[in-house]
Amino acid sequence: MIKVTFLAEQKVKEYSGRVTGFDILQPDALREAIAFKVNGELYDLSREIESDTEIEVIQLSDEAGLDIIRHDAAHIMAQAVKELFPNTQITIGPTIQDGFYYDFATDRTFTTDDLAAIEKKMKEIIKSNHRFVREVWTRKQAIDFFSDIGERYKVDIVSSIPENENLTVYKQGNFVDLCRGPHSPSTGRVKAFKLMKVAGAYWRGDSKGPMLQRIYGTAWRNKDELNTYLKRLEEAEKRDHRKIAKDMDLFHIQEEAVGQIFWHEQGYTLYNVLESYIRKKLMNNGYFEVKTPILVSKELWEKSGHWDKFRENMFIIDESESKKLAIKPMNCPCHVQIFNSHIRSYRDLPIRMAEFGTCHRNESSGSLHGLMRVRGFTQDDAHIFCMEKQVNSETVKFCDLLKEVYSELGFNEISVKFSDRPDTRSGNDEVWDRAERALLEAVKEAGLSYELNPGEGAFYGPKLEFILKDAIGRNWQCGTLQVDFILPERLGAFYIGTDGHKHHPVMLHRAILGTFERFIGILIENYAGKFPVWLAPTQLAILTITNESDGYATEISNVLKEQGVRIKTDLTNEKISYKIRLHSSSKVPILWIIGKNEVTNKTVSVRNLGSEKQESFSLENATELLLKIINLN
């Protein structure tokens, strides 16, 4: 007898032999079911249960169900491509955020017409409602099969699997693909999809390997969800930070410094405003600021463990045959050196050490994307050295600070991913228990909802990832807090405890923005360049109608600059309509327009960004209102 526990209903049923999901689920449940979990592992509904188990039904409404449908769509796309272009070889086709892709080896360059034809063929395959059939094969069986049909990339994948290990393939109609699964019952479960674009990709991500063509697609539960997503993409394209940056003259990137930013006056002003804001928050919350070297000997990276784990992403300089230097990819080992420069007591803890640290990582050129993915960046980095019993209270304080910063920057929807102990880790279970409990209690105390990310903690401790939602519903993972038991020990950090003996501190790695570059990119897209006045690089533009107003405009400008207002005064001979268009396209939030009447009456005409309405204010009232708006933060 096999005993099956239905977790949702908390019911137990017994069956006389092996059963599948189709055998044990009621017809109503089967209509909604995509797959099921057996003792935590995802199974196809057709896969047999062989022993006592706990099951959980996965429906399309679940995230796991949607991910399976996207996986189905990837296989359907591969089948469609093979039917339309038989000489194409298939490689890999995983799911990604919001969709899927599949890489193809072909001499053909896929066009937009090809994508339309592939979509049409996919709809035919979906309408045919082919069953997804799972089969377990030996390694030899798979190599022989894929060799016979000329799929050399599949042979390459199978050849990398240990000889004694079985693998799974899935069949749909006449199409067979190597796959771990699971899949839904049939191709007809895919209800709404669209192919998005074609891009290049290297086989196994190796730039020395063959170039493939990657077709991206998206799939959703229904057409309404698909249309909502496509509209969001349209809006995201309008908000692309690279386009807006050009209009606002914020920054540029060029081939001579790939992955690094040339900040222009307006962009660097925005950068400095954000840095000053964060610095003030840190100082008000008990942090002190340090500055550490950019170029550090490999000896320190070897001691910290980063040389083995991170070397491929470092920029390395050979000073001599025996001495190598690395441009730092992170700040933490250098902060431990500052901690170690004094004898520390338990009375000194916690120590909150912050740095706007410039770091470099050798990211592949294909992964670089405007401000969102760069090689040279600055982190709002800080490390808290504390006793184990202080982890909870320090985490609560950090969560409160993070919520305050995000809210003031315009992000009020925050979620948290909690990553607990991985299988391979340092430290004993008792220490991990205490650290995980401290983080969870802190997140709850801070009033934040969290999602468990099982086994995804670092080898040195559990971590929290903070995700904010922007104005068009996209999620961005920015803030982090990681508990580290290992680095202080590796680098010899200690404090003198109440017992007079040496103890290693716990190190909390934490950031709110992540990197300034990426966060500024997020801000640009969130606000579509229309920043709140306190954050805008130029807060006010004074525009004159004729040169008769120049003296009055200059006088106002000088007074406001002394009060810290970031201001531009346009005294050019251009028409006022042109000046308004020019400064509006630069996203200046407030315009003051000055003509003969304003000079005579000591007034200004105020026009806000996005409005055609102009209102006349006395200079005194306009100034008071402007300063009030600026000083909201």
UniProtKB/Swiss-Prot annotation:
Q: What's the name of its gene? A: thrS
Entry protein name: Threonine--tRNA ligase
Q: What does this protein do?
A: Catalyzes the attachment of threonine to tRNA(Thr) in a two-step reaction: L-threonine is first activated by ATP to form Thr-AMP and then transferred to the acceptor end of tRNA(Thr). Also edits incorrectly charged L-seryl-tRNA(Thr).
- Tell me the domain of life: Bacteria
Which residues of the sequence carry a binding annotation for Zn(2+)?
Answer: 332, 383, 509
Q: Single GO molecular-function term? A: metal ion binding
Per the record, which residues fall in region Catalytic? 240-532
**Which SMART domains does this entry report, sorted A to Z?**
tRNA_SAD
User: What quaternary structure, including any partners, is listed in this protein's UniProt entry?
Assistant: Homodimer.
Q: Where in the cell is it found?
A: Cytoplasm
Query: Which organism does this record belong to?
Result: Wolbachia pipientis subsp. Culex pipiens (strain wPip)
TGS domain ranges (all copies): 1-59
Give the UniProt family note. Answer: Belongs to the class-II aminoacyl-tRNA synthetase family.
Q: Which cofactor does it need?
A: Zn(2+)
Its UniProt entry gives the catalysed reaction(s) as: tRNA(Thr) + L-threonine + ATP = L-threonyl-tRNA(Thr) + AMP + diphosphate + H(+)
* Enzyme Commission number: 6.1.1.3
Which keywords does this Swiss-Prot/TrEMBL entry list? Answer: Aminoacyl-tRNA synthetase, ATP-binding, Cytoplasm, Ligase, Metal-binding, Nucleotide-binding, Protein biosynthesis, RNA-binding, tRNA-binding, Zinc
GO CC field: cytoplasm
| Gene3D superfamilies the record matches | 3.10.20.30, 3.30.54.20, Anticodon-binding domain, Bira Bifunctional Protein, Domain 2, Threonyl-trna Synthetase, Chain A, domain 2
Q: Which Pfam families match?
A: HGTP_anticodon, tRNA-synt_2b, tRNA_SAD
Q: Which GO terms describe its biological process?
A: threonyl-tRNA aminoacylation
